């Protein structure tokens, strides 16, 4: 295993530049002015270094399927679900694995090393779950992949779905998912939530439920999730994804709910790409923004993180697996442009997501696994503004990706000038 010395790094929360000595796959020493005989010295010249990004919400079974068999012309969640049902006819394990592996590589090149994907566990042959379990094993040297057993067709809409969910957990999924707001009735939605908690308790698994992903101010299954979490003592292990309906809740109810979520130590995942594109399609004007109450949740100390959700699939036609791009989008449409909030955006794709995924040994600290990224930026603000490339991605002490940034040369007034979109002393 190689030894690496990272020189002149700007660590988050530190004013002075520092060095990081990597040996035997861990951070052996961190501090200024380090000098060791090593296999490689990387002088990052003041660039921002960070723990790797964590993408806490993906659907790797559906990635790269946009337009197959048809495009989502309405842009709605429901049409996306219908297209996925059509796509499943004849979908092979080989296609799922190829597409998932490609997007995982995109994620790594963009600085992600810890991913959580939902896998369609109600697909009757088990092909989807088996494919992603194989990918998890095949890609383990590159990424840590958590798999959620996700009931794409709900749990109580057809007989046999409960058995399929349990089988997915027996096969080795890491978390149990749910879809209560899409069940046939509110009563079945509550049964959905309780079933998920029961199954998670049985297998000692985490929970990540697609919850209230609509604009209905009466869709309040997240409240049931908070109750079950508190009653069962599962604080910190439960995640509610989306919760876009919270945007439209009565403010008095939202105030009470946020108190429950804090007591339950719930993790919340917002998915800026899909939420901004899919939600409020029937609003007309004025049109709501279609995201959960990110600012209020953060202000109350609730753990909120960002997921990519969909990448070129029936629900969202764009994307390249970049958590930093998701953070930049959320800054705009959740109005998180205050200077301290920009740092929070980076937290939402690093330490907050790591907390959601219950990761251990995460972060730039002596003794931790040497997992880190070097961004082509000098500050968190510029990382968001520029949506910076990852110059280096280091996994267990090995450089697994190197990026050479684009070089732009402007020719004007008889001179050549390099353009990098950064401020200089003359701008101040």
PLM region spans:
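Divalent metal-coordination and catalytic microenvironments
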Residues: 9, 25, 46, 57, ...
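Active-site mouth loops of central-metabolism enzymes
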Residues: 83-98, 148-159, 180-187
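Histidine/acidic residue-rich metal-binding segments in metalloenzymes
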Residues: 127-141, 157-267, 284-306, 362
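Alpha-helical scaffold segments that flank or form the walls of functional sites
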Residues: 66-118, 126-138, 163-170
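Active-site microenvironment of metallo-dependent hydrolases
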Residues: 1-18, 22-28, 32-34, 343-428
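Active-site gating loops and adjacent loop-to-helix segments of metal-dependent hydrolytic enzymes
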Residues: 64-96, 172-175, 221-239, 262-267, ...
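His/Asp/Glu-enriched, well-ordered alpha-helical/loop segment
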Residues: 206, 227-238, 274, 278, ...
């Amino acid at each position: 295993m190689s030894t690496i010395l990272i020189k002149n790094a700007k660590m988050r929360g530190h004013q002075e530049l520092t060095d990081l000595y990597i040996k035997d796959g861990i951070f052996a020493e961190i501090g200024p002015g380090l000098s060791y005989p090593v296999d490689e010295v990387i002088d990052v010249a003041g660039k921002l270094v960070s723990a790797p990004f964590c993408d806490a919400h993906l659907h790797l079974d559906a990635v790269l399927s946009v337009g197959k068999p048809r495009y989502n012309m309405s842009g709605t969640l429901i049409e996306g679900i219908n297209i996925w049902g059509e796509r499943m006819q004849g979908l092979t394990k080989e296609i799922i694995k190829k597409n998932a592996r490609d997007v995982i590589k995109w994620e790594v090149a963009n600085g992600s090393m810890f991913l959580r994907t939902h896998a369609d566990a109600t697909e009757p042959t088990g092909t989807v779950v088996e494919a992603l379990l194989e990918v998890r094993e095949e890609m383990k040297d590159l990424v840590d992949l958590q798999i959620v057993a996700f009931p794409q067709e709900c749990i109580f809409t057809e007989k046999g779905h409960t058995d399929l969910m349990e089988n997915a957990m027996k096969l080795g999924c890491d978390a149990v998912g749910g879809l209560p707001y899409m069940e046939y009735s509110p009563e079945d939605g509550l049964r959905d939530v309780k079933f998920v908690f029961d199954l998670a308790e049985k297998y000692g698994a985490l929970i990540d439920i697609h919850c209230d992903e609509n604009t209905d101010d009466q869709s309040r299954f997240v409240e049931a999730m908070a109750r079950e979490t508190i009653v069962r003592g599962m604080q910190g292990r439960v995640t509610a994804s989306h919760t876009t309906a919270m945007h439209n809740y009565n403010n008095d109810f939202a105030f009470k709910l946020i108190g429950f979520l804090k007591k339950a130590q719930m993790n919340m995942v917002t998915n800026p790409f899909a939420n901004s594109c899919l939600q409020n399609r029937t609003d007309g004007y004025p049109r709501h923004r279609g995201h959960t109450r990110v600012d209020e949740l953060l202000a109350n100390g609730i753990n909120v993180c960002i997921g990519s959700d969909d990448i070129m699939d029936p629900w969202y036609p764009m994307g390249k697996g970049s958590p930093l791009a998701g953070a930049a989008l959320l800054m705009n449409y959740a109005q998180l442009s205050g200077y301290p909030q920009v740092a929070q955006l980076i937290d939402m794709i690093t330490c907050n997501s790591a907390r959601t995924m219950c990761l251990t040994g995460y972060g730039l600290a002596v003794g931790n696994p040497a997992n880190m990224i070097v961004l082509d930026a000098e500050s968190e603000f510029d990382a968001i503004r520029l949506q910076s490339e990852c110059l280096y991605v280091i996994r267990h002490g090995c450089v697994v990706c190197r990026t050479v940034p684009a070089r732009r040369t402007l020719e004007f007034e008889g001179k050549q000038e390099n353009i990098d979109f950064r401020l200089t002393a003359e701008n101040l």
